[in-house]
Amino acid sequence: MDYRKFGECYYIRMDRDDEIISTILEICKKENIKSATFSGIGGCKDAEIQTFIPETGSFEEQHISGMLELASLNGNVVTDKNDVYYHHTHAVFSYKDGEKHCMAAGHMKSITVLYTAEIELRPVTGGAIHRKYDPETGTGFWDFN
């Protein structure tokens, strides 16, 4: 992995076997970025997709592997009032299943790079976005206070 800052944005090149989400969080901590958005593309080999089930307040997980074309990666990083980091990441993958081209998408728990991933990390300027737990839904939301 390597990254550089140009202007207000960080440009990250991830390499084989890098885990995308944990790497983004590590860079945010190292650079003292408390809230940011990010996007990216790449070639991956492993992904854990989560779907939130409101009735149970838990996530269902699906694991996909193989040559996964990361067609779209979007997300954000925020902290809570205690400076604990959280991510909210969604991705879309295309892959082949026999002769069929398939897609998989959703909320991401982890993504492992096969060849490379190219990520743009955009810190929030002029303020901070925090995360606040919502007991009614059992999940966290942005807090601007």
Residue ranges and their predicted role:
Residues 1-39, 45-87, 92-145:
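N-terminal intrinsically disordered, cationic/polar leader segments
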